[in-house]
Every structure is written in structure tokens, then in C-alpha cells.
Amino acid sequence: MSTDWKDLPVAPWLIDTMEQFGFTDMTPVQASVIPMFAGNKDVIVEAVTGSGKTIAFLVPLIQRMLNLLKEGPAVSGRVYSVVVSPTRELARQTYEVLQSILEMGCPEADASDKITLEKKKKGKAAPTMPKKIRGQLIMGGDLPSHMDLKNFLRDKPQIIVATPGRLLELLRAPQIKTSAFDSLVLDEADRLLDLGFGRDITSIINILPKQRRTGLFSATITDAIQNLVKIGLRNPVKIVVKVGGKKEQKTPLSLGLSYVVLEPREKLAYALNLLSIYPYRKAIVYLPTCAAVTYYQQMFSHLNEGREEPYEIYGLHGKLPSSTRIKILNKYQKTGAQAILMTTDIAARGLDIPEVDLVVQLDPPSDADTFQHRCGRAGRAGRQGQAIVLLHKGREEEYVDLMRVRKVKLRPYTGPGSELEGEKLDQEATELYTKLRKWVLEDRQRHDQALLSFVSFVRFYSKHVAQSIFRIQSLDLPGLAASYGLLRLPKMPELRTKDNERPENTWLGEVIDFDTYSYKNPAKEEARLKELEAHKEAMKNKVKIHKTKNDVQKANRAWSSTLQKKEEKSERHQKKQTRINEKIKRDFEEAKDLKQEESKEVVNDWKDMVKKSKKRKVDLPTFDDL
């Protein structure tokens, strides 16, 4: 199998563009897929993350559209080819790659078009050709659906990159015609199904004509995907690209996978040291929850202020508006400075961010597939990368064996930053908590965010898929809470089994008066003080009302009723005492009778014994009688 771009059956300008992008040779997945998909084959492609799948389907799509344009210009309202992406971020990224290819190399007309040249020689009018192949991005949260339709009818794009829901809306519009449809690509197909788009994908497939080419691209092929293949593809060629020809390998050879075992209180100090020492251009730090991303971004920004060469820090999670997420991702991708992206699993799959050298997972994800996709953000397209997961001492060390079963081999980390261990690491963790505690005490809002982040982590951890490894009962919760900068442990149902290990009164250090612990924000502080005053007043009124109610009950009680109750109580007491006395007397009489009977029996026994003794003396012979 040749990996030379010049051996591909595609337009010369496409080959030149790939070389200008710096792709001197094709990756294995590109060399396998492009000739098949550019021809007339449906393909199912299973390849490791970071293997160059995006180029593997965009190049054939562009070539197929070039072939279609030889037959005539694009017609308004006709859909020619579609790339379906599971998320808006991935759709936008795919569209930007497509636009980069088209803008860099796509000519205004194919000068090698034999039909055009022949017609020009014969003096006939050449077919009207579009200036260039066009693409359109269609997704929710960007433009209203009616604007997407308007732009589509006006621009006549040949390649659409879309998310499932918005694409389905477009295809159902009466102005849309699919009779000339050529190619469908399902990118990250397993995730399309995982996110619940199965019904939309089935509807899209049913709307499009059966006479088409379909490419299904995914890192894993599941049973659900096999069912999709049955209804969506015709005699597909399955292409499984293994790295280095090793069946057991699930990640690129250019990507190093490592782990570090730490105490919970040491984790933050180790991560900070690693991000300060490791030589990376861009790094991604994965956190388990949205609340953790918000809090850690602020915390790292504060701790970053004292560095001689501070790095840029960005935060990305699913609770941010789509437009905000896109802006943050664009800034992170385009920055020329050393940068860190703190994110959840929203950025674990599909995103092809250039120059990512380091991935740090502060906690393992809830499933093994996500772990691989997280790691795959580094070491893409042959670039060297390093992925490190931080594990707690104890049960979590078994995670290494779990990943080995999933054909992912993790090795102890020995690179830059690994020398921080033992007493030195413990000292760093102690000093960091002191700094963090001081920072948290400056603004109550920070403690609120730390608390929310810690609580969300505990709930995430308690619902982990691998319950035999990730058990909340085995976790050092005070140490973990200290790494979040908490002042005391919160009261949570998940922490009830850890009561014996809590510090006195749940405080992790010096006791803080929360009544005087204030917000920096004047509006929030004013609201807090009002709420505190209202609470104190309510507590006073509650006690006062309670006392008053008792007093009223006593005051309203009649004297005769009180006397009657006293008499009834006295009578009950006398009756009870009488019963007790009678019982004592009865027990005494019974004991006396029993004693008398026993005495009589003893006397009778002695009389019988004397009689028997006398009789025995009479019966026995004397010595003289012998």
C-alpha cells in the first residue's frame, strides 16, 4: 500500500494542497480509505483516534464533487454531499478544515476538464462552471433554521457539514431536492449513537436516495453501528487500521500513555508542577465536572500570576452557550502562547486541535473508551505526545490492569516533573494548601465554588462505572477536600460512611466564623447580610412563639381542672403503691410457707434416718456370735 499522495486518483491541486499543509505522506487510514471512497465503494472505517480520518473523507468528497461538476453546474435546492458530525464543535472544526483546503487550492474551474476543452475547440458554449466548490456549515445555535435554508438556496453549496437535528430540518424543507445526492459521511458514528441521534440518523438515511456512496468513520465499531450498517450501506468495504500492525495496540505509537499514583492531597501540587516543567506547546487538563472546570480555571489563573512566563488558561464545558464554547476553542487553537485548556469530556472526541503535546487527566473518566479518546487529543497525525492520568493510592491502582484488559498499556510516568515525590511532594502539597486556603478566605464566592466542585466530584465518583475500583468508602475525603481548598467537609449523603474519619466538627483547619466570612461582591455581600439577619430574627421569633404558646396554655387552664388532675394523679399513685405492697406481702407469705414446709421435711428426714440406723444396729451380728 503506497503512502505517496501522488499515487492517488485525485486532482493534482488536491495533492499540492496536502503537501502545502505539511502532509508529506499519507497516514495508513488515508492510504486505505481515499482510493476506495473516491471510487465507488461504501466504506466502514475503524481506526485509532488521531489517525487522520478527517482528511481521509474530505479528500474523496471533494474529488467526487469535482467529478459531478464536469456534468454541469450546481443547481439551487439540490443536496449533493453531507458530513454528519455529533457535536457543533466537531462540525465547525470539520468545516474549517474543508474551507482551508478549498481556499488554498481549489481552482475557479477545472482547466483539465476534457469536455470543456473539446466544446471550446468546436466553438460551442462551454458549460457554466461555478467559481469553486463551496461548503456550508449547518448546526443549531448558530443561525435560525430558515436562515440556513435561505443561505443554502442562495449559495448552492456542494458539501454540507451539519449536526443531525438541523440537517434533518433542512432535508424536510419542500424546496430541497435529493435526487442528485452523491455522498454521505457519518463522522464519529459511535458517538452519534451514544448521544441519542440514532433515530435522526435513520430518518436522514431514509430521506436520501439509496443510490449513493456512504462512509462510516469511527474509533470503535459497536453492535449498534452494525445495525446502522445494515440499513445505510451497500456491500461496504470494512477498513480496520491497526497501528504498527499490532492487534493489541489501541493508540498511536507516537503517543505515550503513563500514570502517576498519588495521595489525594498531593494531586493538585503534582499537576501544577508538571504543567510548569513539561515542555509543551499546548496542554489539555481533563476534569470530571463542569463545576470543577470553572473553579480550577480560576484557581490556576491565580497560582499562575507569580510565574515568570505565565501560560494562558482557558475553560470549556457543556454548560456554556454554544457561541461561547466556539469562541473559547478558537482562541485556544489560534493563540501563539503556551496554553492550557481545562475541559470536561465535551472536548474528548473528534476535536483536532493542533500542537497539543500534553494531556493530563486529574481523574479517570467513567468508561475506558472515553479514556482513549481523551488521550488521543495529543500525538495526532504522527506528532509526539504524552498523556498522563493521576490515580489515588489504593484501589485506583487496579485501573492500570483494567486498561490492560482493554488493550491499553499504561506505564509509570518517568518524564519531566516525575522527580517530585516523597517528602518534597508532601511539603509542596502542604504549602499549596496554605496558599489556597488564604486565597479562598479572601472571597466567600471562591469557597462556594470550591464546595460545589467538591460535591459534584463526590457524586461523579460514587456513580463510576467501575465500582469495584472507584469506591467512595476507600477515598481519603479530608485530603481530597484539602486539595479543593475547602475549609470544612460538607454534609452529604455520600459521606455518611466516612463519619469516623472526619476531623472534629468537620473543620479541616482553623475554625472560621461563617457569619463574618464575606463576599467581595458588594451586592452579594449585602444580600448575605440581609439573609443572615432574617435568619437570626426568625430563630428568635421561633423561640419566643414557642414560649408564648406554653404560657398561654398554662394561663388558659382552669383551676378546677388543674386540681382534678392532681387528685387523679394522686389516686393513681396510691393504687399503684397498694398493688406493690400487696405483691410484697403475698411474696413474703409464700416464702414463709415454703420455709415451714422445708423445715418439716428436714425433721421427718432426720427421724427416718434415726429409725433406719437403729434397725441396722439390731440386724448386724456381733463378734461373739461368730
Curated annotation (Swiss-Prot):
A motif (DEAD box) lies at residues 187-190. Residues 579-611 have a biased composition (Basic and acidic residues). Residues 549-626 are annotated as: Disordered. Residues 273-437 form the Helicase C-terminal domain. One of its GO terms (cellular component) is nucleolus. GO terms for biological process: rRNA processing. One of its GO terms (molecular function) is RNA helicase activity. Its EC number is 3.6.4.-. Gene3D superfamilies: P-loop containing nucleotide triphosphate hydrolases (3.40.50.300). The keyword Ion transport does not apply. Pfam families: CTE_SPB4, CTT_SPB4, DEAD, Helicase_C. The keyword Aminoacyl-tRNA synthetase does not apply. Keywords: ATP-binding, Coiled coil, Helicase, Hydrolase, Nucleotide-binding, Nucleus, Ribosome biogenesis, RNA-binding, rRNA processing. Residues 523-604 form a coiled coil. A motif (Q motif) lies at residues 3-31. It is found in: Nucleus, Nucleolus. InterPro entries: CTT_SPB4 (IPR056330), DEAD/DEAH_box_helicase_dom (IPR011545), Helicase_ATP-bd (IPR014001), Helicase_C-like (IPR001650), P-loop_NTPase (IPR027417), RNA-helicase_DEAD-box_CS (IPR000629), RNA_helicase_DEAD_Q_motif (IPR014014), SPB4-like_CTE (IPR025313). ATP binds at A47, V48, T49, G50, S51, G52, K53, T54. It is an enzyme of class 3 (hydrolase). Residues 34-239 form the Helicase ATP-binding domain. Belongs to the DEAD box helicase family. DDX55/SPB4 subfamily. The Q motif is unique to and characteristic of the DEAD box family of RNA helicases and controls ATP binding and hydrolysis. ATP-binding RNA helicase involved in the biogenesis of 60S ribosomal subunits. Required for the normal formation of 18S rRNA through the processing of pre-rRNAs at sites A0, A1 and A2, and the normal formation of 25S and 5.8S rRNAs through the processing of pre-rRNAs at sites C1 and C2. This is ATP-dependent rRNA helicase SPB4. It comes from Yarrowia lipolytica (strain CLIB 122 / E 150) (Yeast). The lineage of its organism: Eukaryota, Fungi, Dikarya, Ascomycota, Saccharomycotina.
